[in-house]
């Protein structure tokens, strides 16, 4: 079983669970050996795939979509570190999908800049700089400014810097 086939297997299993009658399920798929990958990778990918399968967009819907089928999945593992890592990655993917699914009259450059600033406040190891039209002109970003002329919204260039985690103290 190679990595691509494992991910495809996860997606197909989760798709079947989501469209079926079960509300909760347990999975041992993370225990399958995957060529060239360790068990931590399998657990992490399983968590990411499960979160993707459970995703429902309803940010701008009057009535949130009623969950159909699967709403909770237990993954058989003792590797809590890989589960947490998968959840963190899945959270980032979900946040990105939410932004991508928002209509353009809501998800404007200013809205994206506000989200970036919120991320910088939320995570101490993320820094943000937002350049406005004047700053972009000073830097000679004429191609970007040319594209922005087609919009009624003012351009914003967002620079997010991830500064990594702090090293663990040496004992």
Regions found by a protein language model. Give the residues of each.
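Short amphipathic alpha-helical segment within the helicase RecA-like ATPase core
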Residues: 1-171
């Amino acid at each position: 079983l190679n990595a691509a086939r494992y991910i495809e297997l996860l997606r197909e299993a989760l798709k079947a669970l989501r469209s079926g009658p079960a509300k909760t399920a347990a999975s041992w798929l993370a225990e399958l050996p995957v060529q060239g990958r360790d068990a931590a990778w399998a657990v992490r990918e399983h968590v990411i795939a499960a979160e993707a399968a459970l995703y429902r967009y309803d940010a701008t819907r009057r009535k949130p979509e009623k969950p159909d089928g699967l709403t909770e999945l237990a993954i058989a593992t003792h590797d809590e570190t890989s589960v947490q890592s998968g959840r963190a990655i899945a959270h980032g993917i979900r946040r990105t999908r939410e932004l991508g699914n928002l209509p353009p009259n809501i998800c404007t450059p200013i809205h994206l800049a506000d989200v970036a600033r919120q991320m910088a406040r939320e995570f101490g190891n993320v820094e943000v700089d937002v350049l406005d039209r004047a700053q972009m002109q000073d830097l000679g970003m004429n191609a970007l400014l040319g594209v922005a002329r087609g919009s009624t919204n003012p351009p914003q260039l967002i620079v997010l810097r991830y500064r990594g985690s702090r090293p663990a103290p040496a004992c």
